[in-house]
C-alpha cells in the first residue's frame, strides 16, 4: 500500500508509523470552491434560522457523537496514540461544549441587542430610533488541531461556536487524524439530516498539501478563519487572510510557554509542588498548549529541593509516543539544540525510538537573558526552570516575556505584597491568570478566556474556548428608523424572543 499518491493519502498508525488501511481524498481548490460556494448559498437562511432550531442542531450533533463514541475513540487512539481514557473525556468535553453553545443560542444573549429610543423633540436635533444587534459573518473556515482530535477539530470549539453564531463551517481536517475527522463529520452530516437542514452548512475537506489550507483562506466566500496550530503555519495563513482583496478576521491560537512564578512561601508550604509541576508538564505527553513551559523561582534551598525532586521524577517518566512523526522529530531536534546551549542543565528520562524522552532544563536568570530563543515553545514533554536571584530579578524577567495563553502564580499570603507587583504585568501578557493551580486544564464555561497577546493568539481580544467564543463570528449591525414590522425579532419593541437587552443604556428584559 502506497501511503501517498496524487489523489489520496493515508493516516499513520501513531504507534508503529505504518499507514492505516483507509484512503482519504486529497481535496484541491476545486473542492474548496464547491464547498465555499455552497456554504455561501445557505449562509443567509442559516444566520436567520430561529434560535431554538439552531440550538437543536447543536444538541443533535452532541448526541450523534456520543452514539458513535466507540468508533471515534478506537480510530483516534490508533491515529494519535492518545489513551482511550483521555479520548473518552474529550468526547464528553466536545459534546458538553456543543450543548453549552446551544444554551447560549437559546438565551439570545449573543444578539447583544441594544435599543436607543427616539426623542423627536430633542434640541438642537431630534434623536433617532437606533437599534443594534449582532449577525453572523458568513461561511467560516476552521483548521483542525493535531493535539485535540475532537475538542479542537471537526466538531470542536471553533465549529461549535461558529454554528451557534449561524455561520456555515468548512473544516480543513488535520492530517494527524483524518479517520477520526471523517467519523465526526458523518455525525454532523447525520445531525443536519435529522434537523432537515442543508448539508452545505458543514463540509469536511481533507488533504496533505498546504495548498488546500491556502485556497480555503483565500476564497472570497470565506468570511473568517479559526486556527489552532504552530506559529509558523498560523502566521503564514494570518498574513494570507489579511492580504486578500477583502481582508478577513483570522483567529489563530499559535504558541505559548505559559510562565509559572513560584514564590518562596509556596515552596515551603507545598511538599508536593514538584510532583504537581511534573504531572502538569507531562500531561498528554506535554502536548497541551497550556503546558507550563517555563518556571521562575528564587535561589533558595527550597527551590533547589524542588528542582532535585522534579529531576528525579523526570528520570522516572515513561517513554512518550507523540502525535505524529513530524512532531516527534521537531521535539527531538529542539530538545537537543537547547541542551547543547551554554549555561543550561538538562535531565532526561529513558526512551527508545520511536518514543521520546521527557526533559527538564534548568538555568539561571543571567543565562535566560542571554538566550531569547529559550522563550520559544517546544511542543512535547519538557519544561525549563529559571532560577532568579531575588524577587526584583523575577519581576524584571516577567517584563521580557511575550504573550501566553496563561500565567500561573504559586504563593501564600506572606508573599502577596510581591505578588501584587507581578499581577499587573501578567495581565498584559496572558489571557488567563491561575493562582495556586496549574494551567493545563481549560474549563469550558462562560468566563473562560483561552487566548492572549501574540504569539499566544492573533487576536488577544477574543477567546477560542467558552461561551464568549461565539462573538468571533459575529459583527454588529445598527438599524436606524426601521419600521417595527421590518426589524429582526431581537429588536422588536415587544421583545418576542424574551431576551435580555439594553434600552437607553440600562438592562431590560422587555
UniProtKB/Swiss-Prot annotation:
The active site is at residues 253, 289. Its EC number is 1.2.1.4. It is an enzyme of class 1 (oxidoreductase). It comes from the Bacteria. CDD domains: ALDH_KGSADH. NADP(+) binds at residues 229-234. InterPro entries: Ald_DH/histidinol_DH (IPR016161), Ald_DH_C (IPR016163), Ald_DH_N (IPR016162), Aldehyde_DH_dom (IPR015590), Aldehyde_DH_Superfamily (IPR050740), ALDH_KGSADH (IPR044151). It catalyses: an aldehyde + NADP(+) + H2O = a carboxylate + NADPH + 2 H(+). Keywords: NADP, Oxidoreductase. One of its GO terms (molecular function) is aldehyde dehydrogenase (NADP+) activity. Belongs to the aldehyde dehydrogenase family. Homodimer. PANTHER family: ALDEHYDE DEHYDROGENASE-RELATED, SUCCINATE-SEMIALDEHYDE DEHYDROGENASE, MITOCHONDRIAL. Catalyzes the oxidation of long-chain aliphatic aldehydes to acids. May be implicated in controlling luminescence as it catalyzes the oxidation of the fatty aldehyde substrate for the light-emitting reaction. This is NADP-dependent fatty aldehyde dehydrogenase. The lineage of its organism: Bacteria, Pseudomonadati, Pseudomonadota, Gammaproteobacteria, Vibrionales. The gene is aldH.
